[in-house]
């Protein structure tokens, strides 16, 4: 007997996500830069081992699992090539931070810093923002991610983001700049 409609839909979403990941690995300069930086920093990156597409809670788009050193792309919520590329880039920044900066994600200041960097180097980077709008995007994305991960309100998350913002916002490694590539 074949799978149910939901099983078939889930399999199709996972397959489409995997195709989008392959496209990003082949064509996105930002993704290539992050992967090359991981490899050259002594953090071997093997896509089949370090990236997984899977269904997630509807509130999520992806995540970085430091226990398994794996990026998760949510196949049920990331349905376009551009969204997969954005989330993959964002999560690769976390992977880079974990490997090269020895970030401990259960430390709130480490998490806030990595979320600021991921927003600055990936999530907010596709658009030519003016300075204020870009900074606002980074703070808003980082606070949103913190609120989801820590299950806290935006005000509490914003407090943690503001505490480490300047130092983390100005750390541009390994991309080297903000904005489009």
Which residues are covered by each model-predicted region?
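Active-site recognition of the HExxH zinc-binding catalytic motif
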Residues: 86-98
